[in-house]
């Protein structure tokens, strides 16, 4: 199934679709480093994203990065509500040379985000690295996930962020996988 949101504000104009079919993604955010990270995310999560985005990047990349996180989170929530049969929990460790990241995901319906990741530099190229946390916070809160992201080892900032995006993607893939009995994975019988 394909989920789509068009979101237009005074700061950004977004047209984003999400599918859980593993087909080729098309990502054009206007922010090269973010395009790269989202491409890695789609490859390692098995999700398909189509993103056409423009915005006030002449100010900085904050609005477009955060707004894309918001919309991807909203789309993930729709996918989760439709799917209903999923493993729920996922954990992934990903090394990227000297960097090592761990992400733990719970599709709980209770939004919580812990980001224990001290990045080595404030910028990768022109991209402000503090936006990594902003992107994930926006996505996770809007998808109603519980997520813990920990950067366990660091070094090169590009490697640190790449390990974070890949570990999140792989943990999400595990948590979205169909569960064996087809039931909602909660003793309450519901995840909202």
Curated annotation (Swiss-Prot):
One Gene Ontology term of the molecular function aspect: imidazoleglycerol-phosphate dehydratase activity
Disulfide bond annotation, renumbered to this chain: none
E.C. numbers: 4.2.1.19
Name of the protein in its database record: Imidazoleglycerol-phosphate dehydratase
InterPro entries according to UniProt: IGPD_sf (IPR038494), ImidazoleglycerolP_deHydtase (IPR000807), ImidazoleglycerP_deHydtase_CS (IPR020565), Ribosomal_Su5_D2-typ_SF (IPR020568)
PROSITE patterns attached to this UniProt entry: IGP_DEHYDRATASE_1, IGP_DEHYDRATASE_2
Recorded family membership: Belongs to the imidazoleglycerol-phosphate dehydratase family.
EC class (word): lyase
GO BP annotations, alphabetical order: L-histidine biosynthetic process
Assigned GO CC terms: cytoplasm
Species whose genome carries this gene: Staphylococcus epidermidis (strain ATCC 35984 / DSM 28319 / BCRC 17069 / CCUG 31568 / BM 3577 / RP62A)
Alphabetically ordered keywords of this record: Amino-acid biosynthesis, Cytoplasm, Histidine biosynthesis, Lyase
UniProt subcellular location: Cytoplasm
